[in-house]
Every structure is written in structure tokens, then in C-alpha cells.
């Protein structure tokens, strides 16, 4: 078992997951996560620009600092509404050591950072097929966290997709060795090959089910994180296997109405988790939105 594992009976995430899997879902069991792992993608820009500044600007005093980012996390944790806070390994460790997490919220750490999330200013990595990569060390992470996010991207590109699946297999073996649970993020293709846009939802659904068909219960993800590809696509996946709890990612920033409309449509179509990052961070009042 992970060294960081605590009594899960008080964690709202595990309480809700158990109710959902038992077929006793109610709207109050919808799981809310704040994805504050943007430092793994955007570097200095992770916490966002200061008022009046632009996300593409450069220079000192333009972006919020790491300390401010951590303070944002402490404030949203203290609010007591979230079930999960997702961070980078370094920030998760800091929150744990500072005893900022409390008893009810679950800390999750990004377990890999494939190339399609690399977004430095001036960079162009997402224009190339996703390549698997992981900075984080699960052995070290297990000392303070027992839940990690693992992400995959399929592009209908045989060589790259095989590497993606092989890396996921290796990750699962390491996670089992160190007693770490995971949830699985499957992005839409970032450089799709011979794939029509209207096929994206079914392509992703089939890849998820196919990839997990050979994974036994001990290694299966606790839930999924995918893009919302329409109600029919989400309903197809959520109805296919009740043991797969499906969650949606928030994507880019939007209006408050956009956020609640997405939540409504997702839940109606079988979604049971929302993992929002920029939609919370760039809201006019992040705490009120949560």
C-alpha cells in the first residue's frame, strides 16, 4: 500500500465512487476536481497572468508566481467543496508537507507529462504526434500521495499509438509496485491521421474500451477523464460499462454559463466527474464558481 494512504472512509472522493459503483448515484455524488497542474504544461504561465496582462506576454511581474499558485490551491481547498485537487508532484508535496490538505479532499498528482501537453512560449510540440514521457517518480510520490493522473493520446498512427500503450503498461506495473492508484485521461487526437472530425468521439471510445479490456480490476483506473465529444458519444461510453466511471475535462477558459452548461450536459449523458482547470482559474471569481 502507498505510504501516503490514509483512511479513505472520510474522503469524499472514495465515498462518492463507492456510491456510483453501487448504482446509488444521486446528483450530490457528482465529483468535482480542480486541475492545478498547469506548471507541467505552461511553465511560468501556470498560475495565469495578472490583471491587465496577456497570457502570451513575456517578462517579470506579468504572471502570478509559484507561491501565489500554491496560495490559490490552499484557498480552494479550505473552501471545502472540492473532492480532488490535481497538482504537479512538486506542488503536491509542498501542500502535503504544509498540512494544507485536510481530511476530506484527495490529493492527486500528474503521473506523466506526454509531449502533447508541453506548451512553452515559442514552442510547437503539440503539432507533433504525442510521445509518452513521465517526469514524476512514483516511488517518491507514494510517500505523500496515492492517486495519480495518467494521460494518453491516440492519433491513428500505429508506431506512436503502440508506444503510448506500451508506456501505459509500464506505468501500471510501477503503480502496482508502489501501491499507487490512478485515473486515466485520454485526450482527443492532437495530430489525427486519416481521421474525420466526426469520428473523434467513437475513435476515442473504442480506444479506451480496447485498451482496458486487457487490464484486470487490480490495475484499472478509478475513473476516466475525457473531452466532451457530444452527448451521444459520452452516453455510449458511460452506458457500455457501468464499472467505468466517466469524467470530463474542462478545456479552455469560458464563461460561467459555458461551464454550467457543460456540467449539465455531461451529467445528463452519464458523466459523473468534472475536472476543470482553466475554467476555474480564469473565472472572474474562482471560489464562487467552485
What does each model-identified segment do?
Residues 84-90, 108-110, 151-164, 181-183, ...:
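Catalytic beta/alpha-barrel core
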Residues 89, 250-251, 278:
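Short secondary-structure boundary segments
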Residues 267, 281-290:
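C-terminal helical cap(s) of enzyme catalytic domains, especially alpha/beta-barrels
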Amino acid at each position: 500500500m502507498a505510504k501516503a494512504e490514509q483512511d479513505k472512509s472520510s474522503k469524499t472522493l472514495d465515498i462518492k465512487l463507492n456510491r456510483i459503483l453501487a448504482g446509488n448515484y444521486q446528483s450530490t455524488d457528482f465529483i468535482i476536481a480542480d486541475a492545478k497542474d498547469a506548471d507541467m504544461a505552461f511553465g511560468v504561465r501556470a498560475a495565469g497572468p495578472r490583471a491587465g496582462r496577456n497570457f502570451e506576454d513575456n517578462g517579470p511581474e506579468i504572471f502570478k508566481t509559484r507561491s501565489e499558485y500554491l496560495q490559490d490551491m490552499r484557498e480552494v481547498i479550505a473552501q471545502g467543496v472540492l473532492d480532488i485537487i490535481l497538482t504537479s508532484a512538486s506542488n503536491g508535496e509542498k501542500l502535503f508537507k504544509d498540512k494544507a490538505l485536510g481530511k476530506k479532499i484527495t490529493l492527486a498528482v500528474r503521473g506523466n507529462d506526454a509531449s502533447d501537453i508541453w506548451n512553452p512560449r515559442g514552442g510547437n510540440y503539440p503539432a507533433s504526434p504525442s510521445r509518452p514521457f513521465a517526469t514524476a517518480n512514483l516511488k517518491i510520490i507514494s510517500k505523500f500521495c496515492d492517486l495519480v493522473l495518467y494521460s494518453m493520446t491516440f492519433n491513428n498512427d500505429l508506431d506512436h499509438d503502440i508506444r503510448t500503450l506500451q508506456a501505459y503498461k509500464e506505468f501500471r506495473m510501477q503503480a502496482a509496485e508502489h501501491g499507487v492508484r490512478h485515473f486515466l485521461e485520454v485526450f482527443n487526437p492532437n495530430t489525427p491521421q486519416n481521421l474525420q472530425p466526426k469520428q473523434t468521439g467513437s475513435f476515442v471510445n473504442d480506444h479506451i474500451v480496447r485498451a482496458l479490456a486487457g487490464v484486470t480490476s487490480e490495475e484499472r483506473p478509478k475513473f476516466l477523464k475525457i473531452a466532451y465529444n457530444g452527448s451521444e458519444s459520452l452516453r455510449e461510453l458511460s452506458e457500455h460499462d457501468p464499472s467505468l466511471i466517466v469524467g470530463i475535462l474542462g478545456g479552455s477558459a469560458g464563461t460561467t454559463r459555458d461551464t454550467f452548461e457543460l456540467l449539465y450536459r455531461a451529467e445528463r449523458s452519464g458523466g459523473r466527474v468534472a475536472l476543470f482547470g482553466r475554467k476555474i482559474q480564469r473565472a472572474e471569481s474562482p471560489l464562487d464558481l467552485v
